[in-house]
Amino acid sequence: LLLVALAVAYAVPDPRGVIINLEAGEICLNSAQCKSECCHQESSLSLARCAAKASENSECSAWTLYGVYYKCPCERGLTCQVDKTLVGSIMNTNFGICFDAARSEE
């Protein structure tokens, strides 16, 4: 009976997740896996890890085809001011600065 109870306890899924719902600093393959929705890679040779989104006046990336960013996208409510190009989307080099569009309209 004790073995059955232990087996059930270990079978209950961890809410943190192994493949999705990953915390900052955990290794990822795509931004969809991260709670923050940013899978960040320092260089093409480094492992990608979940990271916080970019804050106001920080460097940011526009949406990328791959779901892995060299610069994280902006936090909710902010806009990444960047000149988007097709080549930049493919090469993951569409970088800009996060700003609050609502504040700049005032």
Curated annotation (Swiss-Prot):
Propeptide boundaries: 12-16
Signal sequence, renumbered to the chain: 1-11
Disulfide linkage: 28-39, 34-50, 38-72, 60-80, 74-98
Compartment(s): Secreted
Chain residues that bind taurodeoxycholate: 63
CDD domains assigned to the protein according to its UniProt record, in alphabetical order: CLPS
Keyword Disulfide bond included in the entry's annotation: yes
Tissue occurrence: Expressed by the pancreas.
InterPro entries referenced in this protein's UniProt entry, alphabetically: CLPS_chr, Colipase, Colipase_C, Colipase_CS, Colipase_N
Gene3D superfamilies per record: Lipase, subunit A
Keyword Cell inner membrane recorded: no
MF GO annotations: enzyme activator activity; lipase binding
GO CC annotations on file: extracellular region
Keywords of this entry: Digestion, Disulfide bond, Lipid degradation, Lipid metabolism, Secreted, Signal
GO biological-process terms attached to the record: digestion; lipid catabolic process; response to food
Highest taxon, organism lineage: Eukaryota
Protein family according to the UniProt entry: Belongs to the colipase family.
Role according to the record: Colipase is a cofactor of pancreatic lipase. It allows the lipase to anchor itself to the lipid-water interface. Without colipase the enzyme is washed off by bile salts, which have an inhibitory effect on the lipase.
Binding partners and assembly: Forms a 1:1 stoichiometric complex with pancreatic lipase.
Protein's name in the database: Colipase A
Organism whose genome encodes this protein: Equus caballus
